[in-house]
Amino acid sequence: MTTLTALSVASEIFPLIKTGGLADVTGALPAAVKAHGVAMRTLVPGYPAVLGGIEDPQQVHSFTEFFGGSARLLAARCDELELLVLDAPHLYVRPGNPYVGPDAKDWPDNALRFAALAQAGAWIGQGLLPGYAPDILHAHDWQTGLLPAYLRYSGRPAPKCVFTIHNLAYQGQFPSELLARIGLPERAFSLDGVEYYGGIGYLKAGLQLADRITTVSPSYALEIQGSEAGMGLEGLLRLRAGQLSGILNGVDTKVWDPSADQLIPATYDVETIGARARNKQALQARFGLRAESGALLFGVISRLSWQKGLDMLLEVLPGMLADGAQLALLGAGDAPLEAGFRDAALKYPGQVGAVIGYDEALAHQIQAGADALLVPSRFEPCGLTQLCALRYGAVPVVARVGGLADTVVDANEMAIATGVATGVQFSPVTADMLTAALTKTRALYADHATWRNLQINGMTTDVSWKNPAQHYAKLYRELVDA
């Protein structure tokens, strides 16, 4: 098998910088496709966390003037990841996270910051670095949406480009006056270019101009072609349906392995699943919950937002707790939801615990100790927490949308009888149906044999990158051979 070279371009990558599932995907993809003959490097911005976490950085190119300041490209490693780092302090060295400042507002120069990333990716793809000529480019989300535009309007030969939508809700829309500042010609500002409702649409540009589009589950690929999930881009996505496909994410099964996880109190596997009881006990103590081994303990690991359906959870919480259930929540996001769960923890001491923020170790501990994991999203491109939940024996209770629908087998009578059920699904996504799903979950939990089968079925489900990597490698080769 001939080795292909691929350059992935992304705004975050695990373990260096992470705000969500995008980082998990970009961090796991290189090793996954390597098994299928694809040598992948990843271009990422030089945030402080990235510069502080890389090994053996070597300058391979410098720019005297690059989007308002000097910059350089560093070749570096982090564990098994082969990286190119865009070290541009005027763009990336600042407090806050990659997209917002300490005041929780978008950085005012985000248009320039991520145009720079896309431009660097395009130049590398077109031979900027001697001796490195990637066969394929793979761009991720709105932050790299201009990459295929830079390729298209350069007038120079370029490799084919795959563009992946991780979440269509984040679109990167900016004023048209920035066109010259981001280095695009006037002809790019057209309906079949980067123009979007009178401005510049970074995500729209990627969808319009990439050679192939992927998103992170087959169901989501269909949903976004409709008005409810299409976010205004459904017409374009229907137009490009022949170039659009859904490839499920996987999880890094070395990072997420309950039999060897150093972040949890007690490791276990399918044969020793009873050891989860120790993790549940520790989790109850960590969240200030009553030490009741028989209480149905729900976990939530989520961004706190309308998309994630956590407002519905607050609405149904009193009824859920009346049945004796417990809730351990880890997340951050919209201020009203943060306040709502803080208040719930005060109102229901011993039954509700909330940690506002993100803590990787605590996320592992919730997966290992919760009886069930709640994911009541109104839409969910793929979702990773439910995949980790399957692997850890925390029964997922999910809305029947996107990747949640594709990865969790509902415990209906037939699925239970045939031994394939792995969780609970509900639809439509309303508070009433969430309540019904919680009631169903309680009934399943009370049937110890059925519940154990759900756990074992989940833990033996292949949630690794093996199958997704095959699909990506096949897609890359199709484009290169076309």
Curated annotation (Swiss-Prot):
Q: Keyword S-adenosyl-L-methionine on this protein?
A: no
For the keyword Transferase, the answer is yes
Q: Which UniProt keywords apply?
A: Glycogen biosynthesis, Glycosyltransferase, Transferase
Q: Name one GO cellular component term.
A: cytosol
Task: Please provide the Gene Ontology terms (biological process) for this protein.
Answer: glycogen biosynthetic process
The enzyme's main class, written as a single word, is transferase
EC numbers on record: 2.4.1.21
Q: Check the record and name the InterPro entries matching this protein.
A: Glyco_trans_1 (IPR001296), GS/SS (IPR011835), Starch_synth_cat_dom (IPR013534)
Under Gene Ontology molecular function, one entry of this record is: alpha-1,4-glucan glucosyltransferase (UDP-glucose donor) activity
Residues binding ADP-alpha-D-glucose, per UniProt: K18
* Catalysed conversion reaction: [(1->4)-alpha-D-glucosyl](n) + ADP-alpha-D-glucose = [(1->4)-alpha-D-glucosyl](n+1) + ADP + H(+)
- Its pathway? Glycan biosynthesis; glycogen biosynthesis
Q: Which family does it belong to?
A: Belongs to the glycosyltransferase 1 family. Bacterial/plant glycogen synthase subfamily.
Q: Which HAMAP family match?
A: Glycogen_synth (MF_00484)
* Function in brief: Synthesizes alpha-1,4-glucan chains using ADP-glucose.
**What is the name of this protein?**
Glycogen synthase
What taxonomic classification does the UniProt entry list for its organism? Bacteria, Pseudomonadati, Pseudomonadota, Alphaproteobacteria, Hyphomicrobiales
